[in-house]
Amino acid sequence: MANYQNATELSKLTLGKSTQYCSEYTADLLQGVPRSLNRDDLALNQSNLPFVGEDVWYGYELSWLNGKGKPVVAVAEFRFACTSDNIVESKSFKLYLNSFNQTRFSSIKDVEKVLTKDLSKIAGSEASVNLFGVDHCPALDIAKKSDKCICIDGEDISIDNYQYDPQLLATAQDERSGSQIEEYLVSHLLKSNCLITNQPDWASIYIHYRGKAIDHSSLLKYLISFRQHNEFHEQCVERIYCDLQQFCQLDELTIFARYTRRGGLDINPFRSSHIEQAPFARTLRQ
């Protein structure tokens, strides 16, 4: 359980509370969560983060009316820099997007401008918004598995700890190689729970690193220990990044978690020691 679950900033959220749906554009529905809540807990300095990256969201339930009242639908891609002040709370994001349903816009560019303005304001940093027709969206292509990507889910492990335990990484420095290696790993077994509602969050997590070899069994046990942990998607990924660097002291590290969608949105946090922009990599479960 996160140490900041009872923070005042969280008690103000509509998440976990009964709400009414609004079908007329309402920017005030958006709510933000300070990134500092999690980062203070990790002893991270917002002005000197140990990583770069972004949060990439895809919205599959966005619709509005054109100037003649005819419905228009689109798939939306939203990108927020990890240096922004706030993450966007997902329920408020869903309610906000729903408020476009009965609102008229002259063009898709007008919708993009409104989304960019509102989301940049709530995030505290410039947001990137791209809208695609459902037949012309790069996000809809399922990424092919790289031959270099190793799935660690087949490790024959015994486990009875489903509470977050970073000490499981204490033995993760594999002695099979004294020299540096480069590996691209994936696990589809990451599950955590919403900090407020306790709803399950499911993800495939990709870990690309260069350094001394990481023991796959220890890493898998560590990832599974998030199974009963309550924290937002972005916060879990930053915790994983920091833990891996603390225990494994890697020269390069990139983590990309692809969460399954809820309420028409999927969230995909990307953190890296050296790469700022996440790739297109939609998984089968998204």
From Swiss-Prot:
InterPro entries: GTP-CH-I_C/QueF, NADPH_dep_7-cyano-7-deazaG_red, QueF, QueF_N, QueF_type2. Catalyzes the NADPH-dependent reduction of 7-cyano-7-deazaguanine (preQ0) to 7-aminomethyl-7-deazaguanine (preQ1). One of its GO terms (cellular component) is cytoplasm. NCBIfam families: QueF. NADPH binds at residues 90-91, 262-263. Pathway: tRNA modification; tRNA-queuosine biosynthesis. Its EC number is 1.7.1.13. It catalyses: 7-aminomethyl-7-carbaguanine + 2 NADP(+) = 7-cyano-7-deazaguanine + 2 NADPH + 3 H(+). Substrate binds at residues 88-90, 233-234. This is NADPH-dependent 7-cyano-7-deazaguanine reductase. PANTHER family: NADPH-DEPENDENT 7-CYANO-7-DEAZAGUANINE REDUCTASE. Belongs to the GTP cyclohydrolase I family. QueF type 2 subfamily. SUPFAM superfamilies: Tetrahydrobiopterin biosynthesis enzymes-like. The active site is at 194 (thioimide intermediate), 201 (proton donor). GO terms for molecular function: preQ1 synthase activity. Homodimer. GO terms for biological process: queuosine biosynthetic process; tRNA modification. It is an enzyme of class 1 (oxidoreductase). The lineage of its organism: Bacteria, Pseudomonadati, Pseudomonadota, Gammaproteobacteria, Alteromonadales. It comes from the Bacteria. Its main location: cytoplasm.
